[in-house]
């Protein structure tokens, strides 16, 4: 899941006496939503965390456009380490800087559009989020970098040829 790490990061930030300026919006649904809301309440974070549940695409876009930093909190494990997370590319396409755990595929996709926290370390994730919140110029540069990477390197028009060639090789090797 990973939301637990984001809640732990929020708690870390809330406990810093000088930080009362960070609000956490968690958009999306899933089977663990009610459990995460309960955990949030138990951690005393109701005043700084909002769970929206699943929202229509336009509302999702509205939420993302108000974010200063986007977070991919998918935990480090063997599957996530090698999986492309659509949200990473969506954040980049919107010109948003992001923070995520240091996953192989996440680093390949985002490159300099992201700061990378130590594997499954919520406090390090919190520190990286604060680093970006405190540096608007860095956020702007990272957001532009990510958007340009999506447009110039990761868009379908750039990746479809390699994908189709891979399928072609696979089917030829199977005699089809």
Annotate the PLM regions.
Residues 17, 21, 27, 34-61:
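Nucleotide-activated donor-binding/catalytic signature segment of Leloir-type glycosyltransferases, i.e.
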Residues 64-82, 96-97:
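Acidic donor-binding loop of glycosyltransferase active sites
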Residues 82, 103-116:
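Short acidic/histidine- and often glycine-rich active-site loop of Leloir-type glycosyltransferases
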Residues 1-12, 31-34, 123:
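A conserved mid-protein helix/loop that constitutes part of the nucleotide-sugar donor-binding site
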Residues 137-169:
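A charged, aromatic-enriched C-terminal amphipathic alpha-helix characteristic of glycosyltransferases
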Residues 114-122, 131-137:
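Conserved acidic donor-binding segment of nucleotide-sugar-dependent glycosyltransferases
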